[in-house]
Amino acid sequence: MAQQTFTGRKRVRKFFGHIKEVAEMPNLIEVQKASYDQFLMVDEPQGGRLDEGLQAVFRSVFPISDFSGTSMLEFVRYEFEQPKYDVDECRQRGMTFAAPLKVTLRLIVFDIDEETGAKSVKDIKEQDVYMGDIPLMTMNGTFIVNGTERVIVSQMHRSPGVFFDHDKGKTHSSGKLLFAARVIPYRGSWLDIEFDAKDIVYARIDRRRKIPVTSLMFALGLDGEAILSTFYKKILYKRTKEGWRVPFDANRFRGYSTINDLIDADTGKVVLEAGKKLTVRAARQLQEKGLKALRLSDEELVGNYLAEDLVNPKTGEIHAEAGEEITDKNMKALNEQGYKELPLLDIDHVNVGAYIRNTLSADKNMTREDALFDIYRVMRPGEPPTLDSAQAMFQSLFFDAERYDLSAVGRVKMNMRLDLDAPDTQRTLRKEDILSVIKTLVDLRDGKGEIDDIDHLGNRRVRSVGELMENQYRIGLLRMERAIKERMSSVDIDTVMPQDLINAKPAAAAVREFFGSSQLSQFMDQTNPLSEITHKRRLSALGPGGLTRERAGFEVRDVHPTHYGRICPIETPEGPNIGLINSLATFARVNKYGFVETPYRKVKDGRVTDEVVYLSAMEEGRYTVAQANVPLDPKGRFTEDLVVCRHAGEVLPVTPDKVDYMDVSPKQLVSVAAALIPFLENDDANRALMGSNMQRQAVPLVRAEAPFVGTGMEGVVARDSGAAIAARRSGVIDQIDATRVVIRATEDLDPTKSGVDIYRLMKYQRSNQSTCINQRPLVKVGDIVKKGDIIADGPSTDLGELALGRNVLVAFMPWNGYNFEDSILLSERIVKEDVFTSIHIEEFEVMARDTKLGPEEITRDIPNVSEEALKNLDEAGIVYIGAEVRAGDILVGKITPKGESPMTPEEKLLRAIFGEKASDVRDTSLRVPPGVQGTIVEVRVFNRHGVDKDERALAIEREEIERLAKDRDDEQAILDRNVYNRLAELLEGRQGIAGPKGFKKDTKITRAVLEEYPKSQWWLFASPNDKLMAEIEAMRKQYDESKKGLEQRFLDKVEKLQRGDELPPGVMKMVKVFVAVKRKIQPGDKMAGRHGNKGVVSKIVPIEDMPFLEDGTHADIVLNPLGVPSRMNVGQILETHLGWACAGLGKRIGQTVDAYLSKQDIKPLKETLKKVYGEDETIKSLNDNELIELGHNLSRGVPIATPVFDGAKEADIEEMLKLAGLDASGQSTVYDGRTGDPFDRKVTVGYIYMLKLHHLVDDKIHARSIGPYSLVTQQPLGGKAQFGGQRFGEMEVWALEAYGAAYTLQEMLTVKSDDVAGRTKVYEAIVRGDDTFEAGIPESFNVLVKEMRSLGLNVDLHNSKMGPAPTSEAAE
């Protein structure tokens, strides 16, 4: 383990893995970034871009010609301009982070000679055209769309190509297998070829009505004879005196049943008696003995088929047609005609079936024209076909590159499956391809070859962001193409420019629609860094062009042998999507064809090399692959005689010389989340699945703590997710505060680049899931960092390692029934010391619109509100930062004008007496919703252009400008320092031939001389050395440019700040308020370990009542031991033991650190560390101060890494426990905190890593009295989000009926629900102090009546005493 990083020296993980890792793990979000980069190709390389991505889209749609061919619009190139706003600005303003796309188009106008029709170029015009904005990907592989971060999930779909399958005997009652072939293009019509129960072969185009496959072949230009000669061999039967002489072929005659004796035509001997069957072996033996030909009689020819038309050459009369069956009758006729030889088809019904011949005879169509008409009628029913239209339509189905595209993948797959050798630029079908497919299908029916497995990863491919976007953009451009063609025909083409022909709206709309509402464009799961990474590595089989949940069967969802090392067998959701949404394995990557590849080490002559090769599922099938944990000697040879290997989905032992490849790492078969579970190999798969899913729901805690028992993957996840900040260049820390780190770069000091890196840290930002994103620096001024070192921790990271939860002391024992059924008992210490406290940031926004009655206003002056309620608002009516607010408090004061409402007589009287005009505005302030209380951490004010900014907006703007100016000044200062130091180095000790005012010519320039003048005048010094002067001049030029660039960037940003914001139409002003809510853990919150052991906190017990150990330490958490055996997740127990050892060792190291602090003796610390870590390179390289810091960091517990499938064994755990001076059983005597008595048996105690999940009781608990009602039924809404009520459902009604509580029931169903008039009456009655009221007609009854009337049934209510009752209309 190379732990020589900055953070790696502060905390060293003891590593238990034995297998060395040869391959570097690829960057975990490479899938997203590489795909989109390939699509955009922002920088145009020399010699133009390759034909892929955006370039390919433009190339495929352009050139566009008008209908008459007089003009043509060509694509030249495209380029991106700078995005208008950067990532942070887009997040804040709710914009999309995108770059404008500029396309250079060339319009060519032709002159057409009217007589000859020859074209000559009349005019060429080139112009740059704006083609909409293309969203850009952020550094972390996400997109910012309308201010929110989104991820485009990669889709798994069936690879284009040809597939052979059968119906598994389900279609026909006899259980006969009906074979079918399907050619799937990337885009275009599907072609199916299938057998029916009578063994006739049919073709279907786009799943429409089937036509005989011979019609398809007629349409391709074959005739009956050509069809037969394509599918069958021709055998010539020659007439001799004794009968017919037939060449003998063992393959053809195997399984032949004789009617008469088989006789050798040359010797006349009987080879096989009548009534017997010729076996394969017997046939082969006969051939070996030299049997050349057989003699057959006339009757044995009956039932064969003719291969050619038999025609009388003189008269042209056809005696028999190709494919005709020989019967006794026509045999006689042929004999009479005197045919000496007959060409017959090699159909024997055993090895070769007569399927195509039977199809040919069953086909009504006899000619190409008939066939084309038939296909036309199938594709376009109801339209009368003409030969031209039918031909054009058939041509466009499979042979037109505009409409049909197999894609390179499809062509490669097709060549592989059918043994063809078409180049992969041939993207349409050819006649040979279709015939090959039919041939292969017929062979399958004859029992030759295998069908395909559609769940094999060689037959499924991944479409990543770039490709999905490419398809979307192509759709947009094609929509645009139609409009362009029409416009080219309708305008005067001589005066028009490309700009006038193009309307980029359809293209931009297609992109916007894809990012905004596609099923694959998802709101990023940002609960913690792991959930971000997993979301970006997700593979979904759903989405447009994919499967649907309802249709997907069991096979698609199941784990397939080819998933090994490519798709994780563990991580997938529980529920309806199981197996349809998967995760990429740790080492997997997607190749250029979209197939998932996994790395293997090459094995040469039984020796494992360090050469790493990536193989796709198809390639892997050809090789034999050994597991990563096979024992090797130091030279890389296998130590065992038989090695267990995988080959073509089977596991089998082979000898070492037969092994081709070996796995690179044991964790290559699982995904990132599963690779974070220690002792995964000891957990049941179902629980491991829950464990990997629940880690993604862990909330970032206030104090992150890395696990004692990790797997070594923690650092990788923290780095690749972008949560922890890594240094871009090596350098020295120059300045630092809570919000930024400034590094002076020391490597590649190219004078053209800035020598300063400023890293802005995110402080208390809200994530998509309302968790808190906060980064804090890990470095001090003067620290030296290398490129890639972690300089700041983010949410859920600790010293550059992923830290989703906390290590807590656990006891596995029952406790008074409080941990029944997976409940969790917690100690009060956990709450008091904020162990599981998390911060959540809620965002509230309010808009002031322009209404018909006048503009809304954001103000502190709100009618009928006490001064007490306004105490947290500033003069602009917006809450202060730092104010503590609770439910119902005003965050932003807002008033809305209201129309004049009719006054009651009493109001009129009061108005007349007091002359006071009632205020004509109502209070529509933004208030804190119920169930929220917290602290205001940020306020943002957005104003429309041209609207005056209020005090608060100006204050925020001033603050922001100051921050930008500070950044500029710091960068400027470091730039000055670097440049002038370099300049002084160049000038010192040189002869000066010129200089600033007062400098004596020909004096030697020294540091003292330089100090006399201000630095800005140093440039005036000159020396006779021309090379030196050229260098100084270049440096000065560069310095001036850098300075100018800095100033310009600063001014641009300030201008953007002051410009005003783009708000939705009708909105004058918008205010966003962010409230930070501190959530301590409480009963009802959900917690979980990493092994799928989840539970709900049932009680928080005072510390003194918790069970305690002999040294008086109280357990933090008590779990039920019964949760382990039936769940079979024993990993949690091993983790507990190992965690116990880690803490014990940490205690010992802590004691040696204390010894150093008191006696200044570092030897005990060094010895202890050596015992724990063995000969660790990192520890040897540390100096005393670093050792003390390390010891201090380890005193809570020594962190260890036990990688998946290659971790600590039982013996290792026992050894660690002994080293820590603990009982090797891992159990301890535990005392009851309430009585002080020891429990009867020893208890398993140790440290386990627990997570607090995002299912918090505060977000779920909900109460209401009166709230909103549904519009149609007038019943109360349901659910917390709608502020709904509790449903009084059917079963609850039965309960009240059973008790005979009639009045209560009536009340529930009427006045407490949807009796509108009754509700108001009840309210009035209660106000009057009257407690009697009557129920009316529920609104839902009126809805039912209306519904019946809409069906034409008039329903009237009649009251038996009073005549017709008033329904709602009557009331109206």
Curated annotation (Swiss-Prot):
Which EC number(s) does the record attach to this protein? 2.7.7.6
- Alphabetical list of PANTHER family matching this protein: DNA-DIRECTED RNA POLYMERASE I SUBUNIT 2 (PTHR20856)
Name of the protein in question = DNA-directed RNA polymerase subunit beta
> What GO CC terms are in its UniProt record?
DNA-directed RNA polymerase complex
Coiled-coil residue spans: none
As for what it does, the entry says: DNA-dependent RNA polymerase catalyzes the transcription of DNA into RNA using the four ribonucleoside triphosphates as substrates.
Q: How does it assemble?
A: The RNAP catalytic core consists of 2 alpha, 1 beta, 1 beta' and 1 omega subunit. When a sigma factor is associated with the core the holoenzyme is formed, which can initiate transcription.
Q: Which key words are in the record?
A: DNA-directed RNA polymerase, Nucleotidyltransferase, Transcription, Transferase
Q: Which family does it belong to?
A: Belongs to the RNA polymerase beta chain family.
> What sort of enzyme, by top EC class, is this?
transferase
Entry keyword annotation includes Nucleotidyltransferase: yes
- The organism's taxonomic lineage, starting at the top: Bacteria, Pseudomonadati, Pseudomonadota, Alphaproteobacteria, Hyphomicrobiales
Q: Which reaction does it catalyse?
A: RNA(n) + a ribonucleoside 5'-triphosphate = RNA(n+1) + diphosphate
Q: Which GO terms describe its biological process?
A: DNA-templated transcription
Highest taxon of the source? Bacteria
Q: Which GO terms describe its molecular function?
A: DNA binding; DNA-directed RNA polymerase activity; ribonucleoside binding
InterPro entries listed in its UniProt record: DNA-dir_RNA_pol_bsu_ext_1_sf, DNA-dir_RNA_pol_bsu_external_1, DNA-dir_RNA_pol_su2, DNA-dir_RNAP_su2_dom, DNA-dir_RNAP_su2_hyb_sf, RNA_pol_bsu_bac, RNA_pol_bsu_CS, RNA_pol_bsu_protrusion
